[in-house]
A protein has these predicted regions:
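Compact, charge-rich alpha-helical regulatory domains located at protein termini
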Residues: 157-226
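Structured, non-catalytic alpha/beta "coupling" segments that mediate domain-domain communication
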Residues: 119-160, 217-218, 222
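A residue-level signal for conserved active-site and pocket-lining positions in enzyme catalytic cores
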Residues: 59, 100, 139, 200, ...
Length: 312
């Protein structure tokens, strides 16, 4: 592998996960709201024009029979745990981007199943068997997680879209610049006439860094079909850890979650003090019987400020 060769990745995407997790009947017009805007809508609701980002009042005007639900992130995460558990049978390296979307490196699983497509189809079979008719699953495979994510959106009725190795940049090129998902940066790029990922990728990396800084550099790497950050070539910082001895032992999950949040805040502060960011977090829980459950969450917005991390 070359110094900056992207990681071959698979993304498993369960569309409309907030709707699926709500367990509402699939043929109902349903919208899940957060901050008074639609974050997910069922196929029936979309047919009436209820789409992501629409305000509550307008969505109800477009679809008077709309069933409105408030978003419950915790419930979505709990429901998605079953999907992650199924994928654990394929690989132990599943990273949760958010409930409804996971990514993992394909090297081991693809070799075991005889190729990227066979591996992706197996993912579809396992997850679809779990979800049944209430949900769908799409799998994208490409060089780098960003390209694999967009490939999962292109899977369509076949449920699988594989971008050949080395072809991620050309696959990404026609996508609109908005696919980067960074509104402020995208707005500037669009005003400069850069309407596609390909036009942005064609710029010199040095020019991008000089004009747009670190955020532009990350976005430029994504547009070029590379990983968000180049492989580390410097020594990692000294080991940092935070710990809390709990006596008597915790018996409730909410108590453990509270302690975990306090420790996470302390750790983030230490990272901030060193000018570092967090790109992944691994949470491990061990029971009194020695059973261990491990989950890895990927933080794709790790370039944002510490204050923003705390706020979200």
């Amino acid at each position: 592998m070359s110094v900056d060769e992207p990681t071959r990745s698979a993304v498993v995407w369960c569309p409309d996960w907030p709707i699926v997790a709500s367990s509402r009947v699939s043929d109902e017009p349903v919208a899940v709201m957060h901050a008074n805007r639609v974050v997910a809508s069922s196929a029936r609701a979309r047919a009436d024009g209820v789409v992501r980002g629409l305000r509550r009042r307008e969505s109800q005007q477009r679809c008077p029979s709309l069933v409105v639900l408030e978003r419950d992130i915790e419930a979505e995460a709990r429901a998605f745990e079953e999907v992650v558990g199924v994928l654990d049978d394929l690989t132990p390296r599943v990273e949760i981007v958010r409930p409804g979307l996971v990514v993992f490196p394909t090297r081991g699983p693809s070799r075991y199943f005889g190729g990227d497509r066979a591996m992706a189809q197996r993912c579809v079979e396992l997850v679809q068997a779990l979800l049944g008719p209430s949900g769908a699953v799409h799998v994208g495979v490409a060089d780098a997680a960003f390209a694999a994510t967009l490939a999962s959106r292109r899977a369509g009725d076949e449920r699988v879209h594989v971008v050949e190795a080395g072809a991620s940049a050309s696959f990404l090129a026609p996508f609109p610049i908005g696919a980067l998902g960074r509104p402020e940066l995208v707005g500037v790029l669009a005003r400069l006439g850069l309407q596609t990922l390909g036009s942005f990728a064609a710029l010199s990396p040095a020019d991008v860094v000089a004009r747009f800084g670190s955020e532009g550099e990350i976005a430029h790497r994504l547009a070029r079909g590379l990983d968000e950050r180049p492989p580390a070539v410097a020594d990692p910082p000294p080991n940092m850890e935070v710990a809390e001895e709990i006596d008597p032992p915790i018996e409730r999950v909410d108590q453990a979650a509270f302690v975990g949040k306090v420790l996470a805040d302390q750790f983030l502060q230490r990272l901030h003090d060193r000018g570092a960011t967090c790109t992944r977090i691994v949470v491990a829980a061990e029971t009194e019987h020695g059973e261990e459950l491990v989950r890895c969450w990927r933080h794709e917005g790790a370039s944002v400020s510490y204050t923003h991390l705390r706020a979200h």
